[in-house]
């Protein structure tokens, strides 16, 4: 009887946990939809900034903008975007494995590595690595969006200043890419030098266009200052978009993790009920046997 009572207690406990995971699944789904809307709202800004940089660069094709041209790589920087919370499956671990492979390749090639981490999970992970220098940290908090944006902007500025000063020669960003609700994958993209502005053929063509005045703006300051400011805004917008996309990945992964937990709870409840019924059946069989034995003795 004690075993049956214990099983009933376990069933009730699993049902309570199932209610919690079910509620967390619904909350994650709601947050994911809201974050996807924000993520899609950032993309037009990034695309417009890209177009303007192309036009301004075409008008000042001879200006050696430090954000646009490659140089010998002696030290690199990484901006790694993770989550602040867990319960999102293997989202962070898969990201860390992906970026760690690239970092190890750089270390083997005797290229120094500086890291800016956004999110407590990345901060805790990279703090344990001896060969990686963490130069900036930041966190994104929905409850304090303005403070989070300032903190992230400051962390990104540290990496931009390092690139401008020549302390790092290339800047990468590692984050999760939102493919679908059930699929998210790690992504590593080059932030600096900006590689998605012009190909070699476009540079040659735009130099010819610039002499004919195809692209022209009225600048309040000189064109070099405007182009530098545009490049910085472009990088900041890319990081902001990546943070929102990573947040969407987090909620999608959490939603699926909670759904799996809820489904597993149902399987556990079914198994516990089966065990309970077996115990009851054994008890009833024993009682019947005792009754029959007593009747035979009479």
From Swiss-Prot:
PROSITE patterns: ATPASE_GAMMA
SUPFAM superfamilies, sorted: ATP synthase (F1-ATPase), gamma subunit
Pfam families, per database record: ATP-synt (PF00231)
Gene Ontology BP term (one): proton motive force-driven plasma membrane ATP synthesis
Subunit and interaction comment: F-type ATPases have 2 components, CF(1) - the catalytic core - and CF(0) - the membrane proton channel. CF(1) has five subunits: alpha(3), beta(3), gamma(1), delta(1), epsilon(1). CF(0) has three main subunits: a, b and c.
Protein task: Produces ATP from ADP in the presence of a proton gradient across the membrane. The gamma chain is believed to be important in regulating ATPase activity and the flow of protons through the CF(0) complex.
UniProt xrefs under PANTHER family: ATP SYNTHASE GAMMA CHAIN, ATP SYNTHASE SUBUNIT GAMMA, MITOCHONDRIAL
Protein name: ATP synthase gamma chain
């Amino acid at each position: 009887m004690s075993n049956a009572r214990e099983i009933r207690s376990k069933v009730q406990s699993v049902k309570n946990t199932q209610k919690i995971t079910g509620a967390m699944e619904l909350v994650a789904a709601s947050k994911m939809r809201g974050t996807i809307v924000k993520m899609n709202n950032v993309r037009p800004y990034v695309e417009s900034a890209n177009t303007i940089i192309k036009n301004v660069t075409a008008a000042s094709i001879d200006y050696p903008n430090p954000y646009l041209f490659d140089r010998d790589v002696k030290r690199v920087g990484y901006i790694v975007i993770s989550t602040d919370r867990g319960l999102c499956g293997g989202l962070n671990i898969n990201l860390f494995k992906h970026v760690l492979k690239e970092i190890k390749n750089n270390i083997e090639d005797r290229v120094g590595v500086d890291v800016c981490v956004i999110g407590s999970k990345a901060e805790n992970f990279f703090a344990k690595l001896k060969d990686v220098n963490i130069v900036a940290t930041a966190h994104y908090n929905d409850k304090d969006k303005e403070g989070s944006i300032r903190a992230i902007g400051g962390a990104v500025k540290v990496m931009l200043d390092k690139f401008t000063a020549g302390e790092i020669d290339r800047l990468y960003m590692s984050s999760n890419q939102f493919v679908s609700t059930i699929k998210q994958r790690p992504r590593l993209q080059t932030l600096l030098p900006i590689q998605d502005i012009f190909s070699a053929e476009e540079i040659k063509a735009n130099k010819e266009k610039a002499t004919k005045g195809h692209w022209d703006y009225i600048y309040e300051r000189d064109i070099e200052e405007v182009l530098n400011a545009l490049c910085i805004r472009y990088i900041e917008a890319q990081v902001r978009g990546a943070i929102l996309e990573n947040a969407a990945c987090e909620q999608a992964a959490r939603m699926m993790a909670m759904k799996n937990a809820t489904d597993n709870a149902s399987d556990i409840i079914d198994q516990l009920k089966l065990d309970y019924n077996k115990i009851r059946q054994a008890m009833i069989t024993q009682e019947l046997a005792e009754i029959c034995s007593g009747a035979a003795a009479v």
